[in-house]
């Protein structure tokens, strides 16, 4: 069915162009830019539309790998272990965000600041880990504000 539809306009073009070229030219330009190009491809254009564009998924894999190489340069990590580490970091960040949000609501403030994040870290992470995280976070914020 599609090839017949394409042949008929092709046959009509020479006859119509002889009659009114000025009327046909503006009508052809608009569909070519927007509608005619996908239709001319036929099945090929349909296949291209069916292909899904991959969503860019943000992961922490490259950062986990960089930290691993800083700590143990000679050790590798399997893809399954990397996936587990990525899930772990996502879970921790989720908990920190929820706790920081709760703290902001308790204090009736619309904004989560570094103070809420710091308190959330102290509440979510245990003991010595919280102390190290707070000191590293403070160092990072200081470096960011100074530059």
Curated annotation (Swiss-Prot):
Can be acetylated to form H2BK6ac, H2BK33ac and H2BK34ac. Disulfide bonds: none annotated. GO terms for molecular function: DNA binding; protein heterodimerization activity; structural constituent of chromatin. It comes from the Eukaryota. Residues 1-31 have a biased composition (Basic and acidic residues). SMART domains: H2B. The modification N6-acetyllysine is found at residues 7, 35-36. Keywords: Acetylation, Chromosome, DNA-binding, Isopeptide bond, Nucleosome core, Nucleus, Ubl conjugation. Residues 1-55 are annotated as: Disordered. There is a cross-link at residue 143 (Glycyl lysine isopeptide (Lys-Gly) (interchain with G-Cter in ubiquitin)). The keyword Transcription does not apply. The keyword Acetylation applies. It is found in: Nucleus; Chromosome. Its main location: nucleus. GO terms for cellular component: nucleosome; nucleus. Core component of nucleosome. Nucleosomes wrap and compact DNA into chromatin, limiting DNA accessibility to the cellular machineries which require DNA as a template. Histones thereby play a central role in transcription regulation, DNA repair, DNA replication and chromosomal stability. DNA accessibility is regulated via a complex set of post-translational modifications of histones, also called histone code, and nucleosome remodeling. Belongs to the histone H2B family. The nucleosome is a histone octamer containing two molecules each of H2A, H2B, H3 and H4 assembled in one H3-H4 heterotetramer and two H2A-H2B heterodimers. The octamer wraps approximately 147 bp of DNA. This is Histone H2B. It comes from Gossypium hirsutum (Upland cotton). The lineage of its organism: Eukaryota, Viridiplantae, Streptophyta, Embryophyta, Tracheophyta.
